[in-house]
Amino acid sequence: FYIRGVDYQPGGSSGISANRDPLSDPDICARDILLFQELGINTIRIYSVNPDLNHDVCMSLLASAGIYLVLDVNSPLPNKHLNRYEPWTSYNIDYLGNVFKVVEQFSYYNNTLGFFAGNEIVNDVTSAKNSPIYVKAVVRDIKMYIEYNSPRPIPVGYSAADDLMYRMPFSEYLECYNENPAESVDFYGVNSYQWCGEQTFYTSGYNILADDYSDYTRPVFFSEYGCNEVLPRRFEEVKSLYSSDMIDVFSGGLVYEFTQEPNNYGLVEVLPSGDVRLLPDFIQLQKQFESLQDLDISSQVASSMRKNVKDMQQRLKTQKSIQPTCQAAYRNIDTSKGVPQSLAEDLIEMGVEVTKGKYVPLTEDQLTSKFKVFEPNG
């Protein structure tokens, strides 16, 4: 499965509250999902939801459009995210209870592709000293909760800042485990903004990224990409990401981001009326995705799968387990205290109380948008 998607959080961090989140308003969902289809994507990433709201219609709309969701379990609201500098103050029952409510509710939608246990939590010296073992603890707790309470297995991963100091050592630490396999991520996302303007596979450094993760035992993809130093963005990296240069290592990616927010990465602008204006970036990305249909992706994927199988067989011959055991230490991050004991055992055993997600029949009205969509020049 190759992810071809966008990051989606209308309103940014203020787009979530007690009353709303990106999947709580069916009218907004219908408007944007029609545009997702025009863009030609198969996956969206959402950074935060409120599990006390109803998401059935929006998730049913996404499913009917053939679109998957990768969902972050944290939110900017109080007690609903890890404090990267003092994680021991936020790793508690209240925090884990909210995480499990998100997981429980969304595990009942079959188009939930995976959960991110964190996003760029390790991004400087202090967070690299204090947070890694707590991120691993949250990964473990979510995976244990899914094992005991979810109707199906769902992968759990992490989304990393593309910081050379921490990217590789932290990915290796999250990949490994000693005794409990739940401490190992199921996938790894990289937020990468290094391809700016006119670049190539080599001048952008994508060749180094592909080389860095060539032996990684978990699926890797871009959880964010799309440098905006040159506007409008041309998205020429799309061809490289889905080419034979990359598909052996990277499973696609998610463009940052759908709606225009203050940081100027938007593909569309939402007008005060709720109508939408497409931005030049939308048209450029659409063209790049359309051009992929001309590439013989299926034969490339088939040959890359054959190569991966051969590599896997070779590795199995040379070592007992392809799953790395944890090292005593990793450069630039502190893992010396070991993974904290879980505070979630009772919650995992009892389960949390939350409305379970379910697909609902959709009416003709729900499948159409009442909003207008304007071209970039009109």
Which functions belong to the PLM regions below?
Residues 1-65, 100:
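Active-site-adjacent substrate/metal-binding segments within catalytic domains
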Residues 3-6, 42-46, 69-73, 113-117, ...:
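Hydrophobic faces of well-ordered beta-strands that scaffold small-molecule active sites
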Residues 15-36, 95-103, 166-181, 234-241:
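Short, acidic/polar
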Residues 127-243:
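Noncatalytic carbohydrate-binding groove/subsite architecture in carbohydrate-active enzymes
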Residues 231-353, 358:
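Substrate-binding cleft of secreted/luminal carbohydrate-active enzymes
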